[in-house]
Swiss-Prot record:
Pfam families in UniProt: FSH1
Organism this protein belongs to: Monascus pilosus
GO biological process: secondary metabolite biosynthetic process
Protein name per the record: Esterase mokD
EC number: 3.1.2.31
Biotechnological and industrial applications of this entry: Monacoline K acts as an inhibitor of HMG-CoA reductase involved in cholesterogenesis. Its hypocholesterolemic activity might be useful for lowering cholesterol levels in the blood and reduce artherosclerosis and coronary heart disease.
């Protein structure tokens, strides 16, 4: 007797690049995004990049994901672990930590590899946007800015982006200023620090230790007409209350329609 195999479900027509937080992993991020993935499963596939450096578990990982390592971080020598204790915007020990430029150079390879592997295996399913969390959200913002400046042509054109509880360092803004020659006060070239052409949704937990920094990222580096902020009752995590999840999906879908990513 011949056993019939159940056909694999058809893949969605487009994909989102997922960038996990510090002290996390693609496998854990997949679980963290389970409600979002379920809601968007007919519209998007999810492509996961793995951070380059082994690390201890990050903020909010324990006890839920205890023993489910290895865990990875994007920035070697990153103070994002210290940020969990409240210092989320001012860490400038440049003598002991790599520069933002050096950190981004290390980030490029694993992100580029994840994208290339996806494009090779799924040439008809383009990556059109991103979903990122915490340190990964800061990484994503910097990558989008680098792409805008013509530095990383290998990154697909991102039309939509979801930033979840974005972690922030002043070093990131200072790096941008130095790259465009603005100097310390930004001057007339301060407009070059703004990410344009990407419709974005910024999720911010009202009790998140990174809330102040997340607000700063939106205020300094995104266009008001292109960026939406959605606050939710929670801390440093993807929204978990049903009404917050529904509102997140609703807002993101609206951005996707506006960007003509979905009909």
């Amino acid at each position: 007797m011949r056993i019939q195999r159940t056909p694999a479900p058809p893949k969605a027509p487009r994909a989102l690049l997922c960038v996990h937080g510090a002290g996390c992993s693609p496998a854990i991020f997949r679980v963290q995004l389970s409600k979002l993935r379920a809601a968007l499963r007919e519209d998007f596939e999810f492509v996961y990049a793995t951070a380059p450096f082994p690390s201890a578990p990050g903020p909010g990982i324990l006890p839920t994901f205890e023993g489910l390592g290895p865990y990875y971080t994007w920035f070697e020598g990153s103070p994002s672990g210290a940020a969990a204790k409240g210092d989320n915007s001012n860490s400038n020990d440049s003598n002991s930590s790599p520069t933002v430029h050096d950190r981004l150079a290390a980030v490029h390879e694993p992100v580029r590899r994840a994208i290339a592997e996806w494009q090779t295996q799924n040439p008809s399913i383009p990556i059109v946007g991103t979903v990122s969390f915490s340190e990964g959200a800061l990484v994503t913002a910097l990558l989008l800015w680098q792409q805008q400046m013509g530095r990383i042509p290998w990154l697909p054109v991102m039309q939509v982006a979801m930033f979840i509880c974005c972690w922030y360092q002043h070093e990131a803004t200072q790096y941008m200023r130095e790259e465009v020659g603005c100097g310390g006060d930004g001057g007339i070239d301060g407009e070059k620090l703004v990410i344009r052409g990407v419709l974005s949704l910024h999720l911010q937990g009202r009790d998140d230790f990174a809330l102040a920094g997340s607000k700063m990222v939106v205020a300094q580096h995104f266009v008001p007409g292109e960026a939406q902020v959605l606050e939710f009752a929670g801390r440093h995590h993807f929204p978990n209350r049903p009404r917050d999840v529904l509102e997140t999906v609703k807002r993101f879908r609206q951005l996707c329609v506006r960007a003509r990513v979905i009909g």
